[in-house]
Amino acid sequence: VDHGQSPDFLGRNFMSTVETAGTLAVRAALLLGVSTTVALAAPAYAQTAAAEDAGDEQIIIVTASKQAKTLQDTPISVSVTSKALIENAQIRDAFDLQSVVPSLRVSQLQSSANTNFIIRGFGNGANNVGIEPSVGVFIDGVYRSRSAAQIGDLPSVERIEVLRGPQSTLFGKNASAGIISVVTSEPKFELGGQAELSYGNYNALIARAEITGPISETIAFSLAGNYNRRDGYVYNEALNINENERNRGGVRAQLLFKPSEDFKLRLIADYDKIDEICCSVVNLVDGPTGNAVRALGGRIISNQPLALRSATNFPSTNLVDNFGFSAQADYNAGQFDLTFIGAYRGVRLSTNADSDFTSADLIGENSARNAIDTYTAEFRVASKFDGPVNFLVGAFYFHENIDASGALTFGRDFRNYASALSGGAYTSLEPTLRALLPGTPAGQFGGRGQGRFEDYDYKNRAISVFGSVDWNIVEDLTLTLGGNYTHDSKTYATNVVTTDVFSGLDLVRAGV
């Protein structure tokens, strides 16, 4: 079964990109590498990140322990994907990341918004809006609480850290399987940028551009945008359309305020959108129920799992809007580093899937519409003593509101389909039920448009304090102790309505 996971070669052709510091360069390459390049001189202010020095290129700095340390000094099982590898492997989003990170698997389910991240075989949460995923995803230190907020194309990425195994001490309740931490590039005090335009098979078109530079001696900016589209590679014979397409894009703006070497404030705002027909499936086995589908005029692609063909009576649509802003302040107070991160994230999604996966109208609607608003704040203090003992302490606040609604209804052919599978028992049951509920019109049991309609209102508040102590006992041997306390409160209200004509029948009172 294929749930929208595209072959690795889709849209991977004819790409070129250039990035400069101190110059602005643009290169576009299409059709076997025909390209043009434009460069112009650019002024540069004095501030330059130490990480850009040539002498530091072989040192890998990670923040897996919420402190900047070398990979060798980080006592956590972590895989680091560098900027160079991301560009060379053409990693566009978190789905592509599994191709270069061992033990990470990304499973796209019945919609783009339902994507499971699995580390070492553990992961959950994509299909239940009331459950947070057990693999936490952080982008620039901001927690993305739902998979719909995690799947947009990755922005200008500096590195990606994948922490394997439980990380609850520093990251709280939603990190029992691991962490994916995406670190993007800060604005630079030198004018520069990059642009990329690529074209591949299935009419894949990817466009990305970024510009960064100084506004003044203390303020720098960056603006970035991306667009990613590709024709679907699964042909729907019933609808004469291609499914499992890509159609997504986004914009991102940053400001970096750095009045001194001891303080900096980084502001980020972003918006991305997904509007795709996804996720088609192909049949592995034409089972005994296939004859019932064909009797209703439906079509099944028999036993051709590699043909990339399907047949449904309406396309499965996915519309996701993901947006937010964050602020991070860092202050060097001598022997202590102080960090504050505050953020708001919003997600609006609407999906509808033909979940019977046939061209017969069995399922009329299987839809979900969610509005998710998430507020987070984190403050931490890390020591920098010269002695053998150092510590990190912090506090985290989480507040989330979710308004969710959905519908699962019968299609036009469901009644006859159920009757065919049950040898007529399904429709013959209706007279008995009508006798128990006088006045019920005939022919409505399992009728078109009937089903279940649900609305949920979730609220989640959590406060946690955490900390760790590192004791350098002897050279090359450090003992780390950590702890976390979390108070988590969830409330919800629900309204579920079943419109089937016999849903109000009390079979117990009726003596059945």
State each model region's role.
Residues 2-89, 95-101, 212, 261-262, ...:
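N-terminal Sec signal peptide and the immediately downstream disordered periplasmic leader
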Residues 55-190:
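Acidic, small-polar-rich N-terminal luminal/periplasmic segments of exported/outer-membrane proteins
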Residues 67-69, 115, 124, 200-202, ...:
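Structural signature of outer-membrane beta-barrel domains
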Residues 86, 98, 160, 180-182, ...:
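Hydrophobic packing within well-folded, soluble alpha/beta domains
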Residues 115, 132-134, 146, 155-158, ...:
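Outer-membrane beta-barrel translocator/receptor signature
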Residues 147, 248-250, 256-258, 268, ...:
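Outer-membrane beta-barrel transmembrane strands
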Residues 181, 188-190, 198, 210-305, ...:
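Periplasmic-side early beta-strands and strand-to-turn transitions of outer-membrane beta-barrels
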Residues 237-242, 392, 399-512:
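Signature of Gram-negative outer-membrane beta-barrel scaffolds
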